[in-house]
Amino acid sequence: MDQFVIQGGTSLAGEVTISGAKNAALPILFAALLADGKSTFTNVPRLRDIVTTEALLKTLGASVNWQGDTLVIDGATVDKTLAPYDLVKQMRASVLTLGPLVARFGEAQVSLPGGCAIGARPVDIHIQGLERMGAQINVENGYINAKVNGRLKGAEIFMEMVSVGATENLLMAATLADGKTVLENAACEPEITDLANCLIAMGAKITGAGTNRIEIEGVERLAGCEHRILPDRIETGTFLVAAAMAGGEVLCKMTDFHSLEPVIEKLRATNALLEVHDNSIYLDMRGRELKAVNIKTAPHPGFPTDMQAQFTALNVVANGSATITETIFENRFMHVPELQRMGANIRLEGNTAICGDTKTLSGAQVMATDLRASASLILTGIVAQGETIVDRIYHVDRGYERIEDKLSALGANIKRRSS
């Protein structure tokens, strides 16, 4: 099993090219199941979750071919509707096959999902929405079994809580439904808008994506399309935080500041100098005092939960004390005990982490527990004194493309090795 070995105490400076967004790519690749032709997706990141998605699409019968950072998927060859446990257990996003399969083929058998262990994240909202559209669903033996006679029917669906995954699943399903579907209390994340733009390119009729009310007028068929995956706002934020923690500078290229405004606002509050342009963001923390900032996660356009762990790490090395409150997931502070092993002054009170002044951070052997937690441990290892070893880095490979190469290019002393 691979691990990262980090020699701490280095500064960071340079440029980094941001990859395509994992959280946009996954639903968009599954959207290819809706089309009866070839779809070409560019700016696709080479990640563990993308490899899992590729394997799942092939299992369903799709033709999948890589050409550089381009993925060509032919949905015309799909001839199976069973998403098996051995693949779905690796990634929660696999449940996004449910909506497209039942919408196009009238049936689906999808294993209950796996992925990061950061909360229950039940699929009830997905199931309830599809039932409102006429699907008959039962869950038994670890599988969601869905059937519909004929086409799904358009419906008005109010989601009891904001759910990115449920919004994506129901949005995809509604594109082939008979009639109009309205999704109320929908998620507003940029990745939802990117998915909608892709579906529109396939021939879907969608308005309101990016707001909490999305309207979809169903069509009888969708064709293949060409679509470029939007830049990864979380990867961008991670590298900006890394430079701020290390007292350095970084230019993030091929990114979009519009999707990252809550993070940029908080970075400015840390006393970082930031310059934003149409497709790049520059941060400079050289010679400046890093200040702790209070964070409260919220659905978009609030502060993203996927940046919570990185800002926890930032507050550990910043001057002053601050609180980090997590409102999205109930179990997303598993990085805190690992940071404490490195000397971090943090205590937990319910869903809030209280970060105080930390005198010294020392390298230690720590364990990644989920994707973003692993990023926080890597960033802390870069600024800690001595050697840090991060185990179970398969988590980071799920969502960051060549993170060690990109950090090394900025000056970090980080190497991958087999333990």
From Swiss-Prot:
The keyword Glycoprotein does not apply. Disulfide bonds: none annotated. It is found in: Cytoplasm. The active site is at C116. The modification 2-(S-cysteinyl)pyruvic acid O-phosphothioketal is found at C116. Pathway: Cell wall biogenesis; peptidoglycan biosynthesis. It catalyses: phosphoenolpyruvate + UDP-N-acetyl-alpha-D-glucosamine = UDP-N-acetyl-3-O-(1-carboxyvinyl)-alpha-D-glucosamine + phosphate. Cell wall formation. Adds enolpyruvyl to UDP-N-acetylglucosamine. This is UDP-N-acetylglucosamine 1-carboxyvinyltransferase. It comes from Pseudoalteromonas translucida (strain TAC 125). The gene is murA.
